[in-house]
Amino acid sequence: MAELATIARPYADALFKASTQQGADLSGTVAWAEELAAIAANPQLRQLADDPKVTDEQLFDVISGVAGSALPDAARNFLRVIIENGRLQALPEVAAQFRSLVNRAGGSSDAVVQSAFPIDAAALAALGTSLEKRFGRKLNLSVQQDQSLIGGIRVVVGDEVLDTSVKARLEQMKAALIA
């Protein structure tokens, strides 16, 4: 089976082109695409989708029923195409690639800030400003708590990592002492 990224790329590109041509709210499209992706990633839903007795229409009804919000027509049409083409397993990757296209068009990137302790809103805003200067682009920050860091933060932006955690410093000292 081909890589999911390869399967997902044309769907993400088509969704991006259709959304921009129709003047759709891209952040709203990202929201419903990620909601559908989260539903499609559910193991029980995957099991249902693999059942040959379940029709495409039944699967569509289940997914649209599970979706917390009323899906816009574009989302419903997109979901139908994904299901009819048997690409439900690729939907999480489609959503990730679509978000990447939207970020690239807007000149921004997603950044994951990992911290040993909770970060309050004011500190996160200040951190965001300094990280945007450091990385040279607007960042969409999300925070994950990871107590194994001991202290400090670790920031992941795409394939770039800025690690100022105590854990990383201890590992650097250990490597220096062993060498």
UniProtKB/Swiss-Prot annotation:
Gene3D superfamilies: N-terminal domain of the delta subunit of the F1F0-ATP synthase (1.10.520.20). Transmembrane segments: none annotated. It is a peripheral membrane protein. InterPro entries: ATP_synth_OSCP/delta_N_sf, ATPase_OSCP/dsu. It is found in: Cell inner membrane. It holds the Pfam family OSCP. One of its GO terms (molecular function) is proton-transporting ATP synthase activity, rotational mechanism. PANTHER family: ATP SYNTHASE DELTA CHAIN. F-type ATPases have 2 components, F(1) - the catalytic core - and F(0) - the membrane proton channel. F(1) has five subunits: alpha(3), beta(3), gamma(1), delta(1), epsilon(1). F(0) has three main subunits: a(1), b(2) and c(10-14). The alpha and beta chains form an alternating ring which encloses part of the gamma chain. F(1) is attached to F(0) by a central stalk formed by the gamma and epsilon chains, while a peripheral stalk is formed by the delta and b chains. F(1)F(0) ATP synthase produces ATP from ADP in the presence of a proton or sodium gradient. F-type ATPases consist of two structural domains, F(1) containing the extramembraneous catalytic core and F(0) containing the membrane proton channel, linked together by a central stalk and a peripheral stalk. During catalysis, ATP synthesis in the catalytic domain of F(1) is coupled via a rotary mechanism of the central stalk subunits to proton translocation. HAMAP family: ATP_synth_delta_bact. This is ATP synthase subunit delta. It comes from Delftia acidovorans (strain DSM 14801 / SPH-1). The gene is atpH.
